[in-house]
């Protein structure tokens, strides 16, 4: 029973973490819309979530690091390395080499893509917690 709850919360935690990371990436793209040569970035949310969940199920935490020197800084257990950032291919080229398409960035940031799904995930987690609390209180 507790394993099911832990797996559910782990999935939701990773989904929220990835959505937050994507929100930061999209915001950085918008902030650099006028920077010459800036390359717009993004992540493949579904692929990253799948990779994270597969790594979590096998008990590994992403890449396995080997310390070959006593001067290496050890990585904390459970630390997740960064998501694979992808370059976004522009629909229209610009003279200064900047690949940020403001219409696309705004639609990904605000219209129901990332932020609405983030809020939906938070709402879902809240409803799960309330349901569990109700079951525990009823005994």
UniProtKB/Swiss-Prot annotation:
| Record-annotated disulphide pairs | none
Q: Where in the cell is it found?
A: Bacterial flagellum basal body
Q: Name one GO biological process term.
A: bacterial-type flagellum-dependent cell motility
Q: Name one GO cellular component term.
A: bacterial-type flagellum basal body, rod
Q: Name one Pfam family in it.
A: Flg_bb_rod
Question: What task does this protein carry out?
Answer: Structural component of flagellum, the bacterial motility apparatus. Part of the rod structure of flagellar basal body.
What PANTHER family has UniProt attached to this entry?
A: FLAGELLAR BASAL BODY ROD PROTEIN FLGB, FLAGELLAR PROTEIN
Q: Which family does it belong to?
A: Belongs to the flagella basal body rod proteins family.
Question: How would you summarize the oligomeric state and partners of this protein?
Answer: The basal body constitutes a major portion of the flagellar organelle and consists of a number of rings mounted on a central rod. In Gram-negative bacteria, at least four rings, L, P, S and M are present, whereas Gram-positive bacteria lack the L and P rings. The rod consists of about 26 subunits of FlgG in the distal portion, and FlgB, FlgC and FlgF build up the proximal portion of the rod with about 6 subunits each.
What this protein is called in its record is Flagellar basal body rod protein FlgB
Q: Which organism is it from?
A: Proteus mirabilis
């Amino acid at each position: 029973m507790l394993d099911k709850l832990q797996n559910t919360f782990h999935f939701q935690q990773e989904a929220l973490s990835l959505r937050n990371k994507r929100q930061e990436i999209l915001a950085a793209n918008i902030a650099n819309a006028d920077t010459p040569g800036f390359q717009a970035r993004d992540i493949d949310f579904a692929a990253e979530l799948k990779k994270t969940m597969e790594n979590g199920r096998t008990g590994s935490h992403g890449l396995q690091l080997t310390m070959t020197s006593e001067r290496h800084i050890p990585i904390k257990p459970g630390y997740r390395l960064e998501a694979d950032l992808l370059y976004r291919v522009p629909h229209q080229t610009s003279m200064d080499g900047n690949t940020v398409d403001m219409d696309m960035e705004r639609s990904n940031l605000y219209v129901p893509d990332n932020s609405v799904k983030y809020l939906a995930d938070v709402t879902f987690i809240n409803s799960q917690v309330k349901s569990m609390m109700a079951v525990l209180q009823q005994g």
